[in-house]
Amino acid sequence: MRISPLIAGLIGGFTAAILQALFKVFPPPAYGICIACHTRDLVNWIINHLFGTTLGMALVSKAFPVLTVVGIFIGALITTFIYKETELKQTHSPVYWFHIRNFSY
């Protein structure tokens, strides 16, 4: 059975809403839109726990980090393997791209 992106999104959204209500987790209002805060909170949580610092993060991430960024990377990795996007492709002008890559710094 094939699940369309719409159905997968609806299932994920409703599941997230139910879990949020169940665990009484209320992040800031824009937390589901902007992923920059998720990355900041994950990095700051790791640094705080490794080095004992007190870098700022959202209250929802104080006890356990928001792993949205990790989920996006894992999903992207799975998608690249499904659609075989890991194969190298031949460029049209190898000499041009050689110079761009090596001398553009």
Swiss-Prot record:
It is a multi-pass membrane protein. One of its GO terms (cellular component) is plasma membrane. This is Uncharacterized protein MJ1590. It comes from the Archaea. Its main location: membrane. It is found in: Cell membrane. The keyword Transmembrane applies. The chain crosses the membrane at residues 3-23, 41-61, 63-83. Keywords: Cell membrane, Membrane, Transmembrane, Transmembrane helix.
